[in-house]
């Protein structure tokens, strides 16, 4: 398991800023939460993203939320949804590598 809290996930364009939370009890699975469109101000700190992550954590799931490229401390530039698909895959790969049986 990966240490929980703020972290950076290596990405082809540099890194993705992320927050990983694990429940206090044995977890039942993992979840990835993505934020709204960044050109509209979306970040992983959006209240809907935060509350969704909190709800998933309360339900016993590991919750990973992250900033897409060019948002917050994530590197790269906005790519009109093309590169952002790679960001989702990178975050999913991170979860698969660190929680292989989930």
Protein language model annotation of sequence segments:
Residues 15-101:
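Serine-hydrolase catalytic machinery in alpha/beta-hydrolase-like enzymes
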Residues 1, 13-15:
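Short amphipathic alpha-helical surface micro-motifs
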Residues 1-7:
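A domain-start/cap signature at the N-terminus of enzymes
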Residues 10:
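Pyridoxal 5′-phosphate
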